[in-house]
UniProtKB/Swiss-Prot annotation:
Compartments (UniProt record): Cell membrane
Name the UniProt record assigns to this protein: A-type ATP synthase subunit K
SUBUNIT field: Has multiple subunits with at least A(3), B(3), C, D, E, F, H, I and proteolipid K(x).
Pfam families the UniProt entry points to: ATP-synt_C
Organism from which the protein derives: Sulfolobus acidocaldarius (strain ATCC 33909 / DSM 639 / JCM 8929 / NBRC 15157 / NCIMB 11770)
């Protein structure tokens, strides 16, 4: 079951990158080096990682908040750290597409 879920999450990202790479002219950096596929993988895998991190941190945070309401700020910081993973993936993808890394 988990293999099917993982494949169903990754397959649309790969297909989208392949379609974008096929439409780009071959003389541009995006079409020649497959940067579109790399950018799609960067965003997709970072979003999956952020989802896992936020889900785990939020579940633990709810448990903490039921016992100690004053820990809200700390829980919010831990959940925000998990969201940072997705932001880094988006930044890296933009750098790949426009700076030609």
């Amino acid at each position: 079951m988990r293999k099917a879920l993982l494949i169903s999450l990754i397959l649309p990202i790969l297909i989208g990158g392949l379609v974008a790479a096929a439409q780009a002219p071959q003389d541009t950096p995006q079409g020649f080096m497959g940067i579109n596929i790399g950018a799609g993988l960067a965003v997709g895998l970072a979003a999956i990682g952020a989802g896992v991190a936020v889900g785990t941190a939020a579940a633990a945070g709810i448990g903490v908040l039921t016992e100690k309401r004053e820990m809200f700020g700390t829980v919010l910081i831990f959940v925000a750290i998990g969201e940072g993973i997705a932001v880094y993936g988006i930044i890296f993808a933009v750098l790949m597409l426009f700076a030609g890394i």
